Amino acid sequence: MTASAPEAPLLRIDAVNKNFGGFVALDNINVEIRKGERFGLIGPNGSGKTTLVNCISGALRPNKGAIVFAGVDITLLPANQRSHRGIARSFQIPRPFRSMTVLENLMVALDFAAHRHLLETEAHRRDSAMSILTRIGLASKAHTATGTLTQVELRKMELARAMATGPKLLISDEAMAGLSTSEVDEVLDLLLSLGSEDIAIIMIEHIMQAVMRFSERVMCLDAGKIIAIGAPGEVMANPRVQEAYLGT
């Protein structure tokens, strides 16, 4: 009996380099991420984390190497085309339309994604928006002005807008920064529930307890290079990680 071939990775980063003048921000990055994988990305400030996810999302283009998503080389594609193919990103500082309600904010994101999801009518998009808000625990805030939301509600709103595009890969950039312990748990539980839906998630986070609880694998960058990758416990026990990231 012939063994089945392993499933192709959802995302493949092949020998990616990114320079800013003479500064090497990323140095020969090679990594694969599976469909539905929960992947933690850590490292000290200036290690290359943001540059890497900017290259993945399309905000930057690498100087060398390739980025392959769902079997397609997207290295040269602009950010909007990557979004339509299934890459979404939430940011540390939410930037909603504060004069709009929570529901209206989500409708804007769904309008952008409409041609992918065949959400042909406003009623269909509204139903989809309410379904997302229910899933993330903001249904009761649907008609609330976004400018009145708390920090944790804004973070959930940011994740909801990312989810509205129907991503295969979600990049969560410091979604828990500045939150209380209980609020961190809320957002973490939400991300874990999204991961159970076969959405791959790259989490950039400085809260180590959250990274350990969330991630199936963790990668640590330092000075633009991968210094460790593997199970969370193994990475955190790595002396190079402790020296570079934890300062021990």
Spell out what each predicted region is.
Residues 2-248:
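Glycine-rich phosphate-binding loops of nucleotide-dependent enzymes
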